[in-house]
Amino acid sequence: MTTILDELRWRGLLYESSDGLDELLTRERVTLYIGFDPSADSLHIGHLLPLLTLARFQRWGHTPIALAGGGTGLIGDPSGKTQERPLLSKEQVAANVEAIKGQLAQFLDFNAGDHSALLLNNADWLTRLSLMDFLRDVGKHLTVNYMLAKDSVRSRMTSETGISFTEFSYMLLQAYDFAYLFEHYGCKLQAGGSDQWGNITAGIELIRRTLGQKAYGLVYPLVTKADGTKFGKTESGAVWLDPKRTSPYRFYQFWYNVDDADVGKYLRYFTWLSADEIEELERITASQPERRTAQQRLAREVTRMVHGETALARAEEASQALFGGSLARLSAGDVIDIFEDVPSTTLPRQDFEGDGFPLIDVLLRCGIATSKSDARRTIEGGGIYVNNIQCPDVGRRLTLNDSIDGQFIVLRKGRKQYHLVKVG
């Protein structure tokens, strides 16, 4: 491989790029930027591709700029949207920018000498731009005809909801960002998802018209799933990078449950593994799909990258719990995550105090056994587990010492029938 573009090509990440970009990257190291929309107080897995694109460029010796959209976030990007989004307050956008800065920073190296990463906020220049200056210095150079030809605008023009002047002007603001970064930071390249191509080329045109210079664009494909459903969404919503919003366990499980048809592509997109390593994992998936070797590697790589080694270890321990693994090191929060969807029964705390609650009675109260004799037979037959430890003692009494953080006891009948006892 001679340039970063060669790596992006074999990973399937080069959707479209400006003419001459190959030659530029062959002869010089460049500064590039990608913008991040602060529409929430956390990034989600849909942001991993842009984050990793910046990181990949930096590993090739280029200088990445992560641009938080504190200014453009006040307007809202119409690209890929079928209707206008509600405007966030200035205070909310500013708070979101501060919240995502740390997530942006963890993927980039800010102490890499002459190609150290930069973290900027376009509110620093957009909020100082007067209306008159904007109309004279930006609006003058891009015709309405030019803007209407862009997919992000044209698709909205033909919809019932249309497009407001506010969102229509977003393209000009993003173009101004590119021109500003070109002039003040020597930024020659903007990257983004394929739905950003129109906005990126508008910036290239503005730079050509106002500065008489050549700039470049590059877009990667939008992430898709083989079954046609939206990537990054689960039944409970988006998969966030913030562990308070999506726990490391659920984050790990998202990647572990990726379909066989998608896992090879996602290994290329979201990890640093080599082509040889990925091809070997694909061969294993083709011959022994039940092992889920590729999915496990994907889950490990991405969880480690986002949450760190300690969180990965806890996520893997938690993942084993549903397959009979030890619960000894799990917290109450882990239990809620893992057993959220299993049947549960709340029993009074006082019943577990003193000598404790007879296991036979607990099984009856939870509906795991239909009668005391049924409970006794199941226990004696080795079919009952307390916190995944087999319990063949019919005289066993459960106490608070059996509970996890004083809140939960996990019962299991046979191999798969779980029941969560909540200590009330």
Curated annotation (Swiss-Prot):
GO molecular function: ATP binding; RNA binding; tyrosine-tRNA ligase activity
Compartments in which it is found: Cytoplasm
Residues spanned by motif 'KMSKS' region: 230-234
Residue span(s) of domain S4 RNA-binding: 357-424
Binding site for L-tyrosine: 33, 170, 174
Catalytic activity: tRNA(Tyr) + L-tyrosine + ATP = L-tyrosyl-tRNA(Tyr) + AMP + diphosphate + H(+)
Enzyme class: ligase
InterPro entries given in the database record: aa-tRNA-synth_I_CS, aa-tRNA-synth_Ic, Rossmann-like_a/b/a_fold, S4_RNA-bd, S4_RNA-bd_sf, SYY-like_C, Tyr-tRNA-ligase, Tyr-tRNA-ligase_bac-type
Gene3D superfamilies, A to Z: HUPs (3.40.50.620), RNA-binding S4 domain (3.10.290.10), Tyrosyl-Transfer RNA Synthetase (1.10.240.10)
Keyword ATP-binding: yes
Keyword list, A-Z: Aminoacyl-tRNA synthetase, ATP-binding, Cytoplasm, Ligase, Nucleotide-binding, Protein biosynthesis, RNA-binding
GO biological process, one term: tyrosyl-tRNA aminoacylation
Motif 'HIGH' region, residue range(s) on this chain: 38-47
Subunit organization: Homodimer.
Annotated family: Belongs to the class-I aminoacyl-tRNA synthetase family. TyrS type 1 subfamily.
Classification via HAMAP family: Tyr_tRNA_synth_type1
Role noted for this protein: Catalyzes the attachment of tyrosine to tRNA(Tyr) in a two-step reaction: tyrosine is first activated by ATP to form Tyr-AMP and then transferred to the acceptor end of tRNA(Tyr).
Official protein name in the record: Tyrosine--tRNA ligase
Classification lineage: Bacteria, Bacillati, Chloroflexota, Chloroflexia, Chloroflexales
